[in-house]
């Protein structure tokens, strides 16, 4: 489809951030330490949980009642994490405009926002995140940069004026945390994203 053509020609937001990140080295150090088999297992486990939780939230917001969880301990964990987000996070969202919104900004970058809706009366890019442990704010710059990138693309594509990003995170101990980026912080991360994007396009030819 057309989406695939665009995706091939345009780097995703996560591709840009991964290539511009200082975290790459710590990730490969960890992989060297635990070995490929264990690293792959841990990554797959995290991905599987994340996928189930995202699908469950999407179904819930679409009014679809379907059990999508695998019948094992991971599925059980994902189910509990989803319930926590539904009970604690979704109450923050007073209106949902769109789910899994595909965004492409003229040959610069592309991405898919989990949710676009209203939080605290403001139009917001909303991302649901699952984690082993709730992360400290200073560790998740990339999540904020990603949200600002999506806001920027959405604003240009649809002539909106979104200037708020919400990261709604749940961990395996069923702790929930809302990170809200707005006003000066939103400007800061938007500028930082533009710098990284520029550097990426100057480093790699797309």
Residue locations for each model-derived region?
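Short, small-residue-biased leader/transition segments that mark boundaries at the very start
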Residues: 2-6
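Short, flexible loop/turn segments with low-complexity composition
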Residues: 72, 205-206
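Short alpha-helical hairpin
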Residues: 8-36
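Mg2+/Mn2+-dependent nuclease catalytic core
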Residues: 97-203
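A non-catalytic, helix-rich entry segment at domain boundaries
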Residues: 35-99
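Short alpha-helix boundary/capping segments
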Residues: 7-10, 45, 138-142
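Residues that form generic nucleotide/phosphate-binding pockets
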Residues: 16-19, 33, 56, 60, ...
């Amino acid at each position: 489809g057309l989406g695939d053509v665009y995706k091939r020609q345009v780097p995703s937001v996560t591709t840009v951030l991964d290539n511009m990140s200082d975290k790459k080295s710590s990730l490969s150090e960890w992989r060297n330490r635990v070995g490929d088999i264990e690293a792959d297992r841990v990554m797959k486990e995290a991905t599987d949980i994340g996928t189930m939780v995202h699908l469950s939230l999407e179904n819930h917001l679409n009014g679809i009642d379907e059990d999508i969880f695998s019948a094992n301990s991971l599925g059980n964990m994902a189910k509990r994490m989803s319930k926590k987000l539904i009970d604690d996070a979704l109450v923050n969202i007073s209106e949902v405009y769109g789910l899994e919104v595909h965004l492409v900004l003229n040959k610069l970058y592309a991405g898919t926002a989990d949710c676009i809706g209203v939080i605290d009366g403001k139009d917001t890019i909303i991302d649901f995140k699952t984690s082993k442990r709730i992360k400290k704010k200073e560790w998740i710059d990339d999540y904020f940069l990603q949200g600002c990138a999506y806001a920027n693309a959405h604003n240009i594509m649809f002539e909106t004026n979104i200037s708020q990003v919400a990261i709604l995170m749940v961990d395996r101990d069923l702790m929930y945390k809302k990170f809200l980026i707005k006003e000066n912080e939103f400007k800061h991360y938007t500028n930082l994203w533009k710098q990284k994007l520029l550097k990426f396009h100057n480093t790699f030819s797309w």
